[in-house]
Amino acid sequence: MTNTLPVAPWRLFSVEIRAVRRLSPSFVRVTFTGPDLDRFADNGYDQRIKLALPLPGQRAVYLPQGPDWYAQWRALPEHRRNPIRTYTARAVRPYLHELDVDLVLHGDGGPASRWAQQVRPGDEIAIAGPDAGYEGDHGGREFRPPSTGCLLLAGDETAVPAISGICERLPLDACGRVLLEVPDPADVLPLVAPPGVEVTWLPRNGGQYGDRLIGAVADAARDLLAASGGGQHRQSTAQPHVPVAGDGMADGAPVDDVDVDTTILWEVPDVPPSAPLYAWLAGEAGVIRTLRRHLVSDCALDRRAVAFMGYWRQGRPDPTS
């Protein structure tokens, strides 16, 4: 009799960078290859993965092995602990043992930004991702729309890979709006979406985060809700107010109870089956907080129909996982 070990939802993959391609001034695509990437689950949509990056001066990653590798990693002294950051699996080609990840170039203010600027073929890292051998829900996906209603997908450049992955998997009869705020007009990338999903790129051109996205989301939400007959726009002529530290909500708390400077803004509620509009928002936490407040407070959209994720916070370092 053979004892078979249970398969965990996630596992570590040892990978090497096969190719690095600059997509635009702000985006670079890294293609990874590895002997076990045929077991990397191709879940699509906004599937999150973890990249363990090299320590300064290294071109490879050396992580603890075994099912408890994460606990072992957390127990390491800080100077020996490889930075781990969260990204989206942009494309998976198991038959070629390949995985694409799109990185945003944000200068060199943190380990992930520095690595993105310096990465080159031949470098080695480790990736924690979904194991195709696991038959249940892997986790790490936050796009959970109702079966009816239109979609509103909005975010800044850090959400472009996830929203692009979502759009590629939408049914052909999907309807809605996609709003993507990016630094530069040259950052407008090819994006595949169903005919009924309108995609709008919003270059900041040196402006502040949210300068274009906040107003665009307000207009799109008003139009989509009016077309569907849902929602009650309580402040039809007002623009969403600019947030200040201390605003926000998470975990069902009132809008003003969470400080995004100290708390991760992240909530993916169970969606009501009859929602006229489903909103998926991701990007800079202060901007996302404002967008969520507008949809729920001003547009009277059921808060269960708004998934919102503060991917990062302006002026604060990206936390280690």
Question: Residue locations for each model-derived region?
Answer:
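Extended, composition-driven regions rather than compact fold-specific motifs
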Residues: 1-321
